[in-house]
């Protein structure tokens, strides 16, 4: 009897193309997928895939995770090659940064398996604002108008913003790199549906490629990644200026996981990030280049070409969000931070009562009077300063909690069993410091 050839799918991204939604869905339905013959590997959850990809691509950028990542790809590889089911699947956006050489290295490491590559592609007019919003949640400080200006600039010397854009949206480069690593019949492109389609459409397209009945999987327990409103994202990037010295993981657990995801994304009625005629025209041309590259690659394509259509804009320029809208976001941010500070303070007080010799009592929270903002020379600066001050205090409390009782449950929990904003937040650091691997 002939030996079985393992089948391995590599979902390589790209960034901001529904990857978090798909990863969450597959994490939540891991056992169901296993019953269908598909392994979504990782003994400790999806974070094992993050560490493994960092390992194989040699992304040694964070000292806190470096030791945990050593040998992670070898462990994940062994798990997949030993699996006796129909196929295994890895989904991790860092793979989209790979050069042709690195892509070949990844595929060669899986020698003996039939490797398929999946690339999800989304209309760039929707990706570009999402990129900037993500940037504001990863310590980014550039304003949206300046970000757009940098992307539109026709210059040989690329800005940091333009480089980030290229890494996330240079689909021709991604197809060329991975197209050299696998035969074209094993290269799959899935077009991300437009927002008007059913939420499950992306999963149904993805499931058709990996050979799964989409109806057997329940929707993710966490909602799809919501977007920050324009004012909330602007507040985040302003606060980031004052938090530039904060470590990435400390920042992610309070600013991204909690303030952004749990407080500011819950604000209703906030206007979306603005666009302009120039940006729409740029996105239209960029989408054409992606479509041409997809056709040239010979890849198996799932989706409708109209999914890459661009909604026109008549705006001649992009203006900053109105100051009052940013102040409203700051008021909600203060309320949210005061709430989490209260929760963390109570936990530290309890830990101090249980072990007064080992745990210091929590520090007193800074006082904030939002009524004074209006009387300040620069009300917005006063508001941002208060938000940053409270965020620092919340981070300090969480650091003490970790030392006292280990990883605290509840607010902004770093749950490594599923896609988490801290794990995904590493993308921001990688994209700032790595060109193409």
How should these model regions be labeled?
Residues 1-437:
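Anion-recognition interface
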């Amino acid at each position: 009897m002939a030996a079985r050839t393992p089948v391995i799918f590599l979902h390589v991204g790209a960034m901001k193309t529904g990857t978090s939604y798909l990863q969450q869905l597959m994490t939540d339905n891991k056992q169901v997928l296993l019953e269908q013959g598909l392994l979504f590997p990782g003994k400790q959850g999806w974070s094992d895939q993050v560490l493994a990809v960092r390992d194989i691509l040699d992304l040694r950028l964070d000292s806190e995770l470096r030791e945990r990542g050593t040998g992670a790809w070898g462990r994940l590889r062994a798990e997949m090659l030993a699996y006796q089911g129909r196929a295994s699947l890895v989904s991790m956006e860092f793979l989209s940064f790979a050069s042709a050489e690195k892509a070949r290295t990844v595929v060669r490491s899986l020698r003996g398996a039939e490797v398929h590559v999946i690339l999800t592609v989304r209309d760039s007019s929707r990706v570009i604002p999402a990129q900037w919003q993500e940037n504001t949640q990863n310590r980014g400080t550039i304003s949206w108008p300046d970000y757009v200006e940098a992307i539109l600039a026709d210059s040989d010397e690329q800005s940091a913003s333009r480089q980030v854009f290229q890494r996330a949206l240079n689909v021709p480069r991604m197809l060329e790199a991975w197209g050299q690593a696998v035969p074209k019949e094993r290269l799959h492109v899935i077009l991300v549906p437009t927002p008007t389609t059913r939420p499950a459409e992306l999963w149904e397209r993805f499931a058709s490629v990996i050979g799964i009945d989409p109806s057997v999987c329940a929707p993710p327990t966490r909602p799809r990644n919501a977007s920050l409103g324009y004012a909330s994202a602007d507040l985040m990037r302003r606060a980031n200026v004052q938090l530039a010295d904060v470590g990435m993981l400390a920042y992610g657990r309070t600013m991204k996981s909690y303030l952004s995801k749990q407080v500011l994304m819950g604000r209703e009625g906030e206007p979306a990030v603005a666009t302009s005629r120039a940006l729409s025209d740029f996105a239209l041309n960029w989408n054409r280049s992606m479509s041409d590259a997809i056709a040239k690659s010979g890849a198996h394509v799932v989706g409708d070409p109209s999914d890459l259509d661009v909604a026109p804009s008549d705006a001649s320029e992009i203006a900053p969000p109105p100051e009052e809208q940013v102040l409203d976001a700051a008021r909600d941010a203060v309320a949210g931070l005061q709430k989490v500070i209260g929760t963390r303070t109570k936990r530290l007080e309890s830990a101090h009562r249980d072990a007064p010799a080992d745990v210091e009592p929590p520090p007193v929270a800074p006082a904030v009077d939002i009524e004074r903002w209006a009387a300040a020379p620069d009300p917005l600066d006063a508001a941002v300063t208060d938000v940053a001050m409270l965020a620092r205090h919340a981070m300090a409390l969480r650091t003490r909690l970790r030392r006292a009782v280990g990883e605290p449950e509840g607010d902004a929990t770093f749950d490594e069993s599923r896609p988490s904003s801290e794990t995904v937040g590493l993308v921001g650091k990688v994209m700032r410091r790595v060109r193409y691997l």
